C-alpha cells in the first residue's frame, strides 16, 4: 500500500523562503500559482507572450519570460504540455538552473523517458494533483483539497523529499493526502490508464456497442443514448462510491446483466491485450512513437482525429445534444 502524508507530517516548510516559478498558466498552472500564493509562497509566472501572460498579469502575478522566471527562482515547476517541455527546458530553463535549485513536474513522462535530462546538482521531484486545475483551485478555496502524488527522482541537496512535501502542502494537497510513488510508477500507470481504460478503452467500447446496435437495425439515436449518453450516469456512481455503489444504485436487471455479460465482453483476451499495451509503455515503444509523431508534425494524429470526428456516433451525438441545452462541453472542441 502507498505511504500517505498529511498536513501534520509537514512540520517545516523548507520552501517558504524560496521563490517559486510556475512555468505555464493553464489548467494546473493557474491553480498551483494561486494556491501557493494564498499559502504565503513567493510566486512568479514564466510564460511566452500571449493570452496566458495577460491573464496571469490580471490575476496579480509578476510575469516574466520562461528564461527570466527560471533565472530568478529557486524552484521551477514545469506545467506545460508534455510535448513542449523538452524544447522549452533546453532553451530557456536548463541554462538558468543553479546548484541546489529544484526542478519540479506534475507528470514524469519527459524525465522517465529521457527527454529532459536534469543536471546532477539540482533536486528533481514531481507533485501531481489527481484532478483538473479548476478542481484543485476550487476545493482549496473552500478549505478542502484534491489528493496528489509525489515522487523524488534526484536528491541533490538531501532534502528533496521535504521540498516535495512542502510544495504539496503549499497547493493544499496535504489536507486530503499525498501518496508517495516513483517517476516510473506515476508515468507508466498514468499512460496505461489513459490508453487501456479512460480514453482508448472507453472510446473503443462505446463505439463497438453503438455499431453493434446500429448494425442490428436499431435507430442510431437510441444506440447513442444507451452506449454513450448514459455512460456519465454510471461513471458518476462509480466515482462517488466505487463499483459497489453503482451496482447498488442500478436496477437488479442491470446488475445481473453486469454479472453475466460483462465478462463476455471484456475477456481474458482483453486483459492479454491490456498487458501488451502496458509492455509497450514500459519498454518505451509508445513514448518513442509519440515523440516521433510529434516531431514529424503529427500527420497520423491529425488524420485519425479527423476520421474519428466523422464517425456516425459523433454525427448523431451533435444533433441529439442540440435537444439538451443542459449538456455543454467544458472546452471548445477544435484542432489541437
From Swiss-Prot:
InterPro entries assigned to the protein according to its UniProt record, in alphabetical order: 6-PGluconate_DH-like_C_sf (IPR008927), KARI (IPR013023), KARI_C (IPR000506), KARI_N (IPR013116), KARI_prok (IPR014359), NAD(P)-bd_dom_sf (IPR036291)
Residue ranges of domain KARI C-terminal knotted in the record: 182-327
Cofactor: Mg(2+)
Protein's pathway: Amino-acid biosynthesis; L-isoleucine biosynthesis; L-isoleucine from 2-oxobutanoate: step 2/4; Amino-acid biosynthesis; L-valine biosynthesis; L-valine from pyruvate: step 2/4
Amino acids binding NADP(+): 25-28, 48, 52, 82-85, 133
One Gene Ontology molecular-function label: ketol-acid reductoisomerase activity
Gene Ontology terms: biological process: isoleucine biosynthetic process; L-valine biosynthetic process
Alphabetically ordered keywords of this record: Amino-acid biosynthesis, Branched-chain amino acid biosynthesis, Magnesium, Metal-binding, NADP, Oxidoreductase
Domain KARI N-terminal Rossmann per the UniProt entry, residue ranges: 2-181
EC number per UniProt: 1.1.1.86
Active-site residues, Swiss-Prot/TrEMBL: 107
Keyword Metal-binding: yes
Co-factor remark: Binds 2 magnesium ions per subunit.
Keyword Oxidoreductase in record: yes
Binding residue positions for Mg(2+) 1: 190, 194
Catalytic activity line of the entry: (2R)-2,3-dihydroxy-3-methylbutanoate + NADP(+) = (2S)-2-acetolactate + NADPH + H(+); (2R,3R)-2,3-dihydroxy-3-methylpentanoate + NADP(+) = (S)-2-ethyl-2-hydroxy-3-oxobutanoate + NADPH + H(+)
Binding sites annotated in the UniProt record for substrate: 251
Superkingdom field: Bacteria
Enzyme class: oxidoreductase
One Pfam family this sequence matches: KARI_N
Function: Involved in the biosynthesis of branched-chain amino acids (BCAA). Catalyzes an alkyl-migration followed by a ketol-acid reduction of (S)-2-acetolactate (S2AL) to yield (R)-2,3-dihydroxy-isovalerate. In the isomerase reaction, S2AL is rearranged via a Mg-dependent methyl migration to produce 3-hydroxy-3-methyl-2-ketobutyrate (HMKB). In the reductase reaction, this 2-ketoacid undergoes a metal-dependent reduction by NADPH to yield (R)-2,3-dihydroxy-isovalerate.
Family (UniProt): Belongs to the ketol-acid reductoisomerase family.
Protein name per its UniProtKB record: Ketol-acid reductoisomerase (NADP(+)) 1
Organism encoding this protein: Bacillus cereus (strain ATCC 14579 / DSM 31 / CCUG 7414 / JCM 2152 / NBRC 15305 / NCIMB 9373 / NCTC 2599 / NRRL B-3711)
Gene name tied to this protein: ilvC1
